[in-house]
UniProtKB/Swiss-Prot annotation:
PROSITE patterns named in the record: ALDEHYDE_DEHYDR_CYS, ALDEHYDE_DEHYDR_GLU
Class in the EC hierarchy, top level: oxidoreductase
Gene coding for it: aldh9a1b
Protein's GO biological process: aldehyde metabolic process; carnitine biosynthetic process; protein homotetramerization
Function of the molecule: Converts gamma-trimethylaminobutyraldehyde into gamma-butyrobetaine with high efficiency (in vitro). Can catalyze the irreversible oxidation of a broad range of aldehydes to the corresponding acids in an NAD-dependent reaction, but with low efficiency.
Pathway this chain belongs to: Amine and polyamine biosynthesis; carnitine biosynthesis
Name this protein carries in UniProt: 4-trimethylaminobutyraldehyde dehydrogenase B
Endpoints of the signal sequence: none
GO MF annotations in UniProt: 4-trimethylammoniobutyraldehyde dehydrogenase activity; aminobutyraldehyde dehydrogenase (NAD+) activity
Subcellular location: Cytoplasm, Cytosol
Amino acid sequence: MALMRCLLPPGFYRTLYHPWTRCASSGTLQIKDPLNFWCGARVDLKDVKTKSEPVFEPATGRVLCRLQTCGSAEVDAAVRNASAAFKVWRKLSGMERARVMLEAARLIEKRREEIAEMEVINNGKSITEARLDVDSARLSIEYFAGQATTLSGQHVQLPGGSFAYTRREPFGVCVGIGAWNYPFQIAAWKSAPAIACGNSMVFKPSPLTPVTAVLLAEIYRQAGAPEGLFNVVQGGQETGSLLCLHPSVEKVSFTGSVPTGKKIMEMASRGVKAVTLELGGKSPLIIFEDTDLENAVRGALMANFLSQGQVCSNGTRVFVQSSIVPQFLKEVVRRTKAISIGDPLLDETRMGALVSKAHLDKVLRYVEQAKNEGAQVLCGGEPFSPADPKLKDGYYMTPCVLDSCTDDMTCVKEEIFGPVMSVLTFDTEDEVLRRANDSDLGLAAGVFTKDVKRAHRVIENLQAGSCFINNYNITPVEVPFGGFKASGIGRENGQVTIEFYSQLKTVVVEMGDVDSLF
């Protein structure tokens, strides 16, 4: 595959791959390698006048590295490199693109433990979850490698032997803007469909979790992708705005909060750019009295405490039918108290640290506000200090279950994005449907019941894009993920995502003479 020439300003340090020093526990790693990546290599901005800000390890609260943020010149360099890569990549057949993607998936599997450890160190989630996130990233790339080989259009026969056909074509340079809760997975979920369709991508991770996206960039390059196919630029709001407003960018895909999503949509509209928005949620989980209680409790825990509760699709409004509330609460509180909190790099840990001190404080304030508004704390909701002294400054809290919640409480109306479960009671199906849909958000919803007719009837009437029956937070890459209402536009994963990373061209072919009115 032809390599494109890339010019870097003098003083930039370039290298393709830096092996990480492996660590056995939290608090032992310092990252000194550059975290920006374009022109097929890491880019050091130390000789460029650019901002630098600290990145913290959530498990210990110590500084993990310093982030060099990208300004206008750096963003432009990355986009220009992506534009050059696009011209090469779009001309390859679907099979040729698939080979590169499958090799990237193989390299991810080979480096699974290393990537998972880096995700834990930068994000704070448990190593058990991080491994599953890396697996999801790999599976998404494998899935869309298959889609790359089957991209096709439609043939339409017209009168007189004439015909028309359609063809799917890439946009060009796509921008991906990731969230801090699934850094590596989101980078893969956004890049896989983009490059399968023949696009290139410039990806901006959250400044809180900048470390692992650059590993994916290295992996794509090692797999045989042209330099510039997947680039990483670091920074915050200013860098994101530069990307969204860049005239050479044709598509923006964002995962994050509703307010930021609205700003991105507004910026993209100035250039009439396509957007995919995966935004917030305040999702309902409905548990009927005929449910298998054991599975319902498991589902409620999965719907609230994965990744320390920092999951946009979490079912944080848990509606439980009145007759089974005592049994449900007894069991869910018992299991919540038993959740192992501590060093996220230890296999026995089930809940690690929240992503930042500011976010931890915000979640704890929500718990205090819930108590002030009349909710009852059945367990948790307090700062937690693990026994290991090196973790004393980490961002930990005990998972919280709130009872006596009502629909008008702040904890029920606003997305907390932490390990806080709000339990509400209901009596009838019609009542719970009305209350469950009383939200501007519609990302996800779930129902637990043994009545198959009721299950499908309730799901049909729930205003949410990603729904679950007798399970929760299951996101196989083969099926689309995304929301209704203010929770977003477009979908991640599944075959339909191809439509959000490509544009349709119609070609009409005349086989006879031209009829003219003139």
